[in-house]
Amino acid sequence: MTQVLVRNGIQAVGDGLTSLIIVGKKSVLKNVTFEGKFKEVAQKFVTDGDSWNSMISRIPASGRHPLHYELAHLITVPDASSRGNTPTNAHSIYKELKPINYPEDTKNVHFVLFAEYPDVLSHVAAIARTFCKFSMKTSGIRELNVNIDVVCDKLTNEDAVFLTDLSESVRETARLIDTPANILTTDALVDEAVKVGNATGSKITVIRGEELLKAGFGGIYHVGKAGPTPPAFVVLSHEVPGSTEHIALVGKGVVYDTGGLQIKTKTGMPNMKRDMGGAAGMLEAYSALVKHGFSQTLHACLCIVENNVSPIANKPDDIIKMLSGKTVEINNTDAEGRLILADGVFYAKETLKATTIFDMATLTGAQAWLSGRLHGAAMTNDEQLENEIIKAGKASGDLVAPMLFAPDLFFGDLKSSIADMKNSNLGKMDGPPSAVAGLFIGAHIGFGEGLRWLHLDIAAPAEVGDRGTGYGPALFSTLLGKYTSVPMLKQ
């Protein structure tokens, strides 16, 4: 299994064939001198300082430049960016790295990352997510030793340890997303959560199967009751006495979404194994934060189901009662994510007494029309929180764009004549579909009245091509990092 290790400064690598990847913005690279440890690792591919200086002066401001029969590469990261992009331009690193085919006998991939302090986290995360963990090819998974040596005066050893853990969290998120539902069943995802809970010394609560119905979790139970393995609600709690903040990370964990009785098409159903990307990202964000001295109370709440077809599955026209006590007329069995998240956020508010609630989900296909394939779409009742998560998105590379929060204008789109609300609007609506879906969740906690609530739809940025991106841990580590002991997260 490939391991990714982040180190403070340039260091030696292990024995065997090594591929060298030099990464940095051109404005930073032009100040790099060909001497010392950099010369030691680069001189196999760049003959001398004059050659280095000549190359840096002539290469384009962005792109990948193969060196020495493609055993080494120089990646220049654009300095300029638009207002809606991240100034770190982290996506360009992923774009340039992903096509590289390392020579068959490569043992080590040695990254030398020259970066300014604010850019380091997003650049490391972009590099890490190119090394996918899941594969069932009979040829096996290549085992590489990946070292990311960061050259940055302000970087501390504690930063480097955190970045190693963050890299693992990003890659674990992607692994969970890439794992098919015949392997990552609801039971298996519960086991993954329990493993994280044990590793972080967390309090673990698991409510499963018929226990959900008895406890009133109507959304989670009724969506998941038709699945081959039982639905579950898992809470990991990092409780700090005297906390002034009680934060809940709520994730949608639909291990497979057939659409239910209103079944998806033959082209719409493939890749629905990824519908647990919100739960995966929140689980691994929780792990990264708690491992590094999170000083406030933090909970991860995972709503885990398989939305399948059976004689007992939810039917259009069914009315179910939610944990909030509200009733919902189901008119769309493929609008299941909002049903399970509504139970999750209500539990976070009423049982965990959370002062801030985040929910994250691969919720709506319409999200890509609202904010594109690279930006998650955020809706919140708190303008300051909206600004904070957009800023964190730019710093982390997990980009975020705002969507409208206007329950007084748009919640009427879910009006029902026989229940408190419908779970979707199948006709013309006043609100954007992704925002209306988010408002359904918020309706069960009074649209965040008395607390801060943010809903994040990541249907598009959770994936790229055939792979998960690991979206989430970098974003929430940056957003909530001020409560950790990591210097780079406190800037």
From Swiss-Prot:
Q: Under which EC number(s) is this enzyme classified? A: 3.4.11.1
Name the residues that bind Zn(2+) 2: K252, D257, D275, E336
Q: Which domain of life is it from?
A: Eukaryota
Q: Supply the InterPro entries for this chain.
A: Leucine_aapep/pepB, NPEPL1_N, Peptidase_M17_C
Q: Which reaction does it catalyse?
A: Release of an N-terminal amino acid, Xaa-|-Yaa-, in which Xaa is preferably Leu, but may be other amino acids including Pro although not Arg or Lys, and Yaa may be Pro. Amino acid amides and methyl esters are also readily hydrolyzed, but rates on arylamides are exceedingly low
User: Which tissues express it?
Assistant: Expressed in the buccal cavity, pharynx, anterior gut and rectum.
Which GO biological process entries does UniProt record here? proteolysis; regulation of egg-laying behavior; regulation of growth rate
Provide the residue positions that the database annotates as binding Zn(2+) 1. D257, D334, E336
Cofactor stoichiometry and binding remark: Binds 2 Zn(2+) ions per subunit.
**Which co-factors does it depend on?**
Zn(2+)
Gene Ontology MF: a single term: identical protein binding
Q: Provide the alphabetized UniProt keywords.
A: Aminopeptidase, Hydrolase, Metal-binding, Protease, Zinc
Top-level EC class: hydrolase
GO cellular component terms listed in the entry, alphabetical order: cytoplasm
What are the positions of the active site?
A: K264, R338
Q: What's this protein's family per the entry?
A: Belongs to the peptidase M17 family.
Q: What does this protein do?
A: Probably acts as a digestive enzyme.
| Protein name, UniProt field | Leucine aminopeptidase 1
Q: What species is this protein from?
A: Caenorhabditis elegans
Organism ancestry: Eukaryota, Metazoa, Ecdysozoa, Nematoda, Chromadorea
GN (gene name): lap-1
